[in-house]
């Protein structure tokens, strides 16, 4: 599994013009926007490992984690994170897991974050989403497990 993690001061996601998720950390605080990609070999153990890594990664103020600060998290699936761009000018999506594999694992990742104590908002799997964010720093990390 792969996660693109961004430290944000706010983030929201809209589907068909309707807001389906929003995080607004307390004034001066941060949250995380996490875009998640799934490949064919991923499983529930990797989803749980990725959730722990994201929740405890010390990328917020004073080298603290989202867990330390109870920072909110917005999660959205993004199959394009699995793109292979090494050849030609057209990305290959063959590494991206199909919906029947990917959707339950994104749900598992989100559930694992909640079990760890995170306040989690989500996008809608497989839908065209408009994501708005204020990236602070900027701080953007790519995490593979």
Curated annotation (Swiss-Prot):
Q: What reaction does this catalyse?
A: glycyl-tRNA(Ala) + H2O = tRNA(Ala) + glycine + H(+); a D-aminoacyl-tRNA + H2O = a tRNA + a D-alpha-amino acid + H(+)
Annotated Gene Ontology cellular components are:
cytoplasm
Where along the sequence does the record place the motif called Gly-cisPro motif, important for rejection of L-amino acids?
A: 137-138
Q: What EC number(s) is this enzyme filed under?
A: 3.1.1.96
Q: Which SUPFAM superfamilies match?
A: DTD-like (SSF69500)
Alphabetized, the UniProt keywords read: Cytoplasm, Hydrolase, RNA-binding, tRNA-binding
Q: Which Gene3D superfamilies match?
A: D-tyrosyl-tRNA(Tyr) deacylase
Subcellular location field: Cytoplasm
Q: Which GO terms describe its biological process?
A: D-amino acid catabolic process
Any Pfam family the entry gives: Tyr_Deacylase
- InterPro entries per UniProt: Daa-tRNA_deacyls_DTD, DTD-like_sf
Gene Ontology molecular function? D-tyrosyl-tRNA(Tyr) deacylase activity; Gly-tRNA(Ala) deacylase activity; Ser(Gly)-tRNA(Ala) hydrolase activity; tRNA binding
For this chain, the family text in UniProt reads: Belongs to the DTD family.
Q: How does it assemble?
A: Homodimer.
Q: What does this protein do?
A: An aminoacyl-tRNA editing enzyme that deacylates mischarged D-aminoacyl-tRNAs. Also deacylates mischarged glycyl-tRNA(Ala), protecting cells against glycine mischarging by AlaRS. Acts via tRNA-based rather than protein-based catalysis; rejects L-amino acids rather than detecting D-amino acids in the active site. By recycling D-aminoacyl-tRNA to D-amino acids and free tRNA molecules, this enzyme counteracts the toxicity associated with the formation of D-aminoacyl-tRNA entities in vivo and helps enforce protein L-homochirality.
**In the UniProt entry, what is the domain comment?**
A Gly-cisPro motif from one monomer fits into the active site of the other monomer to allow specific chiral rejection of L-amino acids.
- What is the name listed in the Swiss-Prot or TrEMBL entry for this protein? D-aminoacyl-tRNA deacylase
* Gene (UniProt): dtd
């Amino acid at each position: 599994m792969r996660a693109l993690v961004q430290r944000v001061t706010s983030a929201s996601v809209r589907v068909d013009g309707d807001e389906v998720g929003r995080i607004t950390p307390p004034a001066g605080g941060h949250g995380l926007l996490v875009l998640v990609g799934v490949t064919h070999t991923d499983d529930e153990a990797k989803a749980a490992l990725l959730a722990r890594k994201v929740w405890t990664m010390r990328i917020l103020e004073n080298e603290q984690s989202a867990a330390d600060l109870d920072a909110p998290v917005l999660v959205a699936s993004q199959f394009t994170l699995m793109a292979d761009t090494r050849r030609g000018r057209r990305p290959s999506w063959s590494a991206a897991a199909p919906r029947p594999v990917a959707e339950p694992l994104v749900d598992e990742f989100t559930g694992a974050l909640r079990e760890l104590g995170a306040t989690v908002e989500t996008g809608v799997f497989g839908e065209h989403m408009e994501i708005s964010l204020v990236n602070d720093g900027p701080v953007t990390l790519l995490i593979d497990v």
